[in-house]
Every structure is written in C-alpha cells, then in structure tokens.
Amino acid sequence: MSEMTPREIVHELNRHIIGQDKAKRSVAIALRNRWRRMQLEESLRVEVTPKNILMIGPTGVGKTEIARRLAKLANAPFIKVEATKFTEVGYVGKEVETIIRDLTDVAVKMTHQQAMEKVKFRAEEQAEERVLDALLPPARDAWGQSEQKEDTSNTRQIFRKKLREGQLDDKEIEIDVAAPQMGVEIMAPPGMEEMTNQLQGMFQNLAGDTKKKRKLKIKDAMKALAEEEAAKLVNQEELKESAIFNVENNGIVFIDEIDKICKRGESSGPDVSREGVQRDLLPLIEGSTVSTKHGMVKTDHILFVASGAFQVAKPSDLIPELQGRLPIRVELEALTSNDFKRILTEPKASLTEQYIALMKTESVDVEFTEDGITQIAEAAWTVNETTENIGARRLHTVMERLMDEISYDATEKAGEKFVINAAYVKDRLGDTIEDEDLSRFIL
C-alpha cells in the first residue's frame, strides 16, 4: 500500500492533470487515511470507516483521469467500473456484486506477482540446477542413485559460469516442464460469469499436473523453469488470505457515470438499470459480505469513489440512502482556454510532445510555437462553447485535424521541419471554427 503523503500524491497527480485542485486534495486525503487507519490498534481500526467521495463535473475535465492515475499511485487493489453496465438482481445483466469479485481477482493477481518476486532468486537458483542437470546428467550407480564425482563437479562449475555469462543462451536442451493447461471455453448467460469460472477451474483441475518433454533454448528454458519453481515455493492458501485482507482493508472501487443511473422525471414502470442498481449498490457501500471464488469478502472498509457529469440529472436525484453514503462532494470546474494551453504543454507526455515524437520516427521535425499553442487552445475552447462542451477531449479532435496533412505526407517529407504557429493554425482550422454548422460535424 502507498505511504505517500497527501502533498506528494497531489504533486504526482499535477504531473498528469491540470487544475481540479479540490478533487486532487480529496482523493489524496482519502488515500492517506487508508494508511493512517492501518496504523491504529485493532479495536479502533474496526470502527474507522472510509469517507466515500462523489466527484461532480462536466465531461472531459479529468474525473476518469484522476481515477486512472490514482490506480497507479495507490499500490492497492483498485478497480474502475461503469455504473451503466449493471442491472438489478433478477434481470439479465451483470449484478453489482461482480464489482467485488473482480476487485478480489485483481488483488489475488497483485499478491501473486509480489509473492513470485520474493521467491524469484531461489527459483532462479533451482532452475539453474535443473538446466545443468539437463546439460550434464549425473552419473548413476548400479542401484540407480546419482554419484557426485569430483571431475563432474568441476565441469558443472565451468558450465555454470558459462550459463551465467549467457554463452549458452542459444543452445537447445530437452527438459520436463509442466504441460500447459487446456483452456475450456464455456458460453454462459449474462450474470453467471462466476459459475462459469468455477466450472472452468474444475475442468482444468481434472487434468492434473502433467509433465511434458519440450525442446527449448536455454534462455527460454531458464524462464519457464524459474516460473515453475517459483509457483512451487508460493503457498496458494496464504496468498488468497493475504489478497482478501488487502481487498477488505485497502481496496478502492471507482464507479464512473453514476449520474446515468439516476431516475429522471416522473416515469412509471420498472427502472431496471437505474434505481434498482442504486439500491443494489447500497449494501456494498454500507458494508456486506460477498461470496467470491477465493473466499468471503467484507466490504465495510472498501473505499468507493463515484463520479458523474450530472448534466441532465442532479446529485439530489440519487436515492437519499445512496447520497448519505457518499458524504464527501467535490465539484470539478469546466476547463478554460488557459487550462487547454497548459494541458497542451505541461503534463508529462503532453499532446504536443506525443505528436513531435511520432513525427520524429519519420525524420520530420515539428515545432509548436507559443502563439501556435495559444491559438490551438482558443480554437478548442471556441468549438466547445459554440457546440457541445466535451472538455479536454476536444483537443484530440482539433490536434488530429491540425496535424492531418503533416501526418499524411510525413513519409515523403523526411528531413523537413514544420513550424506550427498561429498563422498555420488559422489556415488549417479558421474556416471550420467560424462555420458553426461545419464545426458540429468535423470538430
């Protein structure tokens, strides 16, 4: 789990996301509180529940990007889901409990990788011995027992040295490795994915652990044998227990598009994908026990971060019980022309940086001037204001339109240099931006 301070988390988010300081502060505090809670005594730790967050803001202002970056920083089980993918219990579709099952799968995979990393050195040592056995089979006595002779031992050390120096990488050897498990594909109706996974696991277990002789280059053989030896050294039951503990205490669920499951207007009849889903989410967020293939998972201390544009619906359209379970409200501001300018240049691997690097592969130099970047930002902002406001995503559309000709002719223009200044931007985009009807369809 991440031990970064709130200030460090915000600093890291600033490298990729422009503005939205309130949202960054809220998620940074929530993430740090996960660490603080784990430092408490057991009796008090049980009482401290996470303060779930609701992020409100128009499309394209950074809600989803904050979630993506948070996932990398958290170093904890994290899953992002779309609220619109779920239906209430009893209808065809995914049930909300699959969120926790998927989160547990993420945790098991994460814990497995960490466990494999810990035993990597021992596994590589054992793999090395198996490769040396294949290169120099030990002599056996009349009873079939292996004999260790001094000259054989010396030869083995010579081969070990060559193996470590990579001199034998391309030599082929025949080894016994675990046969790949047969994949059993089972078509299941929606909502029954858990049962399908259990059936697939059952069929794979029936095959058992069989060995198969394979001819591999030593480099590939070392890798295959190291993985096999590492798997033997890892205790699967302990691994599952550790993963479930990690989910229950450090797990984070990001629910996007939550505004799309609000009930709109005075509609009559069942609202399968809206209010019913909200009611199903209640026990998960409040705290319940979910059955997964790895064991029972309690959701009492999982942090939930929900986000939505709320352009048609309002946060008050969520059912009152769900509103109460998302106590921290953060409003993200719409982006200005100046924000667009910063987005084009400041973040790590910014859009302008990406286009310069892409054209460099064709030996074409592209330079963006200060006034050119200002003009691109203003063009994107103008189109957002006059048509539909899609936030920073508009920059992708404008940049593609702007770079279209250079990208198409790049192969024939190797060695040339293009300067993207205000005049070039106006020339390429001017007419389209001024004609509102045209910009609706092109930008």
From Swiss-Prot:
GO biological process terms held by the UniProt record: protein unfolding; proteolysis involved in protein catabolic process
Molecular-function GO term, any one: ATP hydrolysis activity
Localization per Swiss-Prot or TrEMBL: Cytoplasm
Annotated Gene Ontology cellular component terms: HslUV protease complex
Binding residues for ATP: 18, 60-65, 256, 321, 393
Chief location of this protein within or outside the cell: cytoplasm
Keyword vocabulary terms for this entry: ATP-binding, Chaperone, Cytoplasm, Nucleotide-binding
Family: Belongs to the ClpX chaperone family. HslU subfamily.
Its biological purpose: ATPase subunit of a proteasome-like degradation complex; this subunit has chaperone activity. The binding of ATP and its subsequent hydrolysis by HslU are essential for unfolding of protein substrates subsequently hydrolyzed by HslV. HslU recognizes the N-terminal part of its protein substrates and unfolds these before they are guided to HslV for hydrolysis.
PANTHER family: ATP-DEPENDENT CLP PROTEASE ATP-BINDING SUBUNIT CLPX-LIKE, MITOCHONDRIAL-RELATED, ATP-DEPENDENT PROTEASE ATPASE SUBUNIT HSLU
Assembly, per entry: A double ring-shaped homohexamer of HslV is capped on each side by a ring-shaped HslU homohexamer. The assembly of the HslU/HslV complex is dependent on binding of ATP.
HAMAP family membership: HslU (MF_00249)
The name this protein goes by in its record: ATP-dependent protease ATPase subunit HslU
Organism: Vibrio campbellii (strain ATCC BAA-1116)
